[in-house]
A protein has these predicted regions:
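Short hydrophobic/aromatic helix or loop-helix immediately within or flanking a transmembrane segment
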Residues: 41-45, 56-84, 179
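Transmembrane-helix signature of polytopic, membrane-embedded enzymes
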Residues: 99-126
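Short acidic/glycine- and proline-prone juxtamembrane loop motifs at membrane-interface regions
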Residues: 133-142
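Membrane-lumen/periplasm interface segments of specific transmembrane helices
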Residues: 211-290, 315-319
């Protein structure tokens, strides 16, 4: 093949992958309804209509109501109605995702190379934790975490603007606080981030300014939030503590560490059963490399086996989703995160690209792992479902492959294949499958989409069953009680609009 044809084919493939990611998101924007998305919007709408956090709202996820409330408030102020607000919110989230993906690409293009930065940016663009675009607490946590990383990376990254523009650190602190607010369990990442800023600024008083600005910003944001909540309760601090205690002791989260470990152990065999074939193939390829003359040592051979396993799992997850019609299948995320962590460890003493590796490790990978471990302890969801929280460490781990001391063409090609595998696992199932009511998926070719013309979901399409349910919800019904302690049903969620 001539040298002129090779770049042309590569550009065509990259363009097709970009179209795949966009097509998956556009499909998600216009087709499908999901109860968690409606629930997230109903929390925001309750703030718009006058309910107050911890006073007339009792849901455990109420802290994630502020961003949806801003979007819904803007929409209702302009239009005077909630008809079509779901499509507006989805469009706003899609615009934010596009901006973050472009920002990610521009920030890391020099460090990672244009091709791999582009593929990882597409993976970040295509990924939504719960398969819908609405800003629920998990989606907010991921996207605010990404924004915080990009702000902090812009301040600490080597280059002419390093340690300039403290506003970046302040903005990163605001985004980190919004991430913690949306999903309080991820607060475990805060001490890791503070330690990271301390280590990255070590050796100079000027460099340490970033840490103090970050801490001060977090303190101001925390204080402002407490004042906002208190003013809705008549500044009764004792009442706020009592309400918070009641919400934090929700019966559905009343389990011990031993109970949680038992739950996780019960799912471990299923995880191993779905991963062993890919792991065996990865080990076999790494062993074959050693047999045919590669003298890499145990640590490097294990690194190679882990990355082979991660790549095979990304392909397996994509194929399994289409075969079993299952959207919640992300075993590749812990594989990528684990392989990336091992790469960081193997390269810890290498001088080449060390500053960039430190940034990815301390600002991206390690805070993500810390947050995941605390989520793993504090949530009731099944072990495989928690893997969605490892997507960000998986992205950081893949980027670490390109920050080798002496990256070769093989390293760049391997990183590109891994990033493409991550992208396919995120985009293909969402493009080809549609989530139906009852957590069940159907191929997009098998459903009969029906356009919704009334209510908050107007302008979107859904399968006939979900559309009929949405239409039934728009019939007159009693308003949702402000003090409902349990999670609303589909009917009460829709009637809240």
């Amino acid at each position: 093949m001539s040298h002129t044809k090779k770049p042309t084919i590569e550009k065509i493939i990259l363009a097709l992958l970009g179209l795949l990611a966009l097509a998956a998101l556009v499909r998600t924007m216009f087709l499908g309804l999901e109860i968690d998305e409606e629930y997230a919007l109903s929390l925001g709408f309750r703030l718009v209509r006058g309910d107050r956090l911890f006073y007339s709202m009792w849901e455990p996820h109420q802290l994630a109501a502020l961003p949806p409330a801003l979007l819904i408030g803007l929409f209702t102020a302009v239009t005077g109605t909630t008809t079509g607000v779901l499509l507006f919110v989805r469009g706003a989230v899609l615009a934010v995702k596009l901006a973050l993906a472009v920002w990610f690409y521009r920030s890391l293009r020099v460090a990672l190379g244009g091709r791999c930065a582009y593929l990882l940016a597409l993976a970040v663009l295509a990924f939504t934790p719960k398969w819908f675009l609405g800003p629920d607490y998990v989606s907010q946590q991921f996207h605010f975490t990404l924004a915080a990383f990009l702000f902090l990376y812009g301040y600490y990254a080597p280059g002419p603007r390093q340690y300039r523009g403290l506003w970046r650190v302040a903005a990163g602190g605001v985004c980190a606080c919004l991430s913690f607010l949306a999903y309080p369990q991820t607060l475990a990442a805060a001490p890791v981030l503070m330690l990271a800023l301390l280590l990255l600024g070590r050796g100079s008083a000027d460099k340490c300014r970033g840490l103090w600005v970050f801490v001060l910003t977090c303190a101001v944001c925390g204080g402002a939030f407490v004042v906002y909540v208190l003013q809705g309760m008549g500044f009764d601090f004792a009442a706020l503590l009592a309400r918070a205690d009641l919400i934090l002791h929700d019966p559905q989260y009343d389990f011990t560490t031993a109970d949680r470990l038992a739950m996780l152990r019960s799912k471990l065999s299923a995880v191993i059963g779905n991963c062993w074939l890919s792991a065996l193939a990865g080990v076999a390829l790494a062993a074959a490399g050693m047999l045919f003359g590669e003298r890499r040592g145990f640590a490097r051979s294990l690194e190679k086996a882990l990355w082979y396993t991660a790549f095979f799992l990304s392909l397996w997850c994509t194929a399994y989703c289409l075969r079993a019609q299952e959207l919640d299948f992300r075993y590749m995320c812990p594989a990528f995160a684990l392989a990336g962590g091992w790469t960081f460890w193997c390269d810890r003493r290498e001088a080449g690209h060390r500053p960039l590796r430190r940034l990815l490790f301390w600002l991206g990978w390690l805070p993500g792992i810390a947050a995941y471990l605390f989520i793993l302890r504090s949530t009731l969801i099944a072990l495989p479902t928690t893997f969605m929280y490892l997507f960000w460490p998986a992205v950081c781990g893949t980027a670490a492959l390109l920050l080798k001391p002496r990256p070769t063409r093989r390293h760049r090609a391997a990183a590109a294949l891994l990033a493409a595998g991550l992208l396919l696992a995120c985009a293909v199932p969402r493009l080809c499958l549609v989530l139906e009511t009852g957590w069940h998926c159907e191929p997009i070719t098998a459903i009969q989409p029906e356009r919704i013309t009334r209510g908050p979901a107007a302008g979107t399409w859904a399968d006939t069953k979900a559309a009929d349910m949405q239409d039934a919800c728009m019939k007159p019904s009693p308003p949702m009680r402000a003090r409902a302690c349990s999670r609303p049903s589909v009917s009460s969620t829709a009637s809240a609009f």
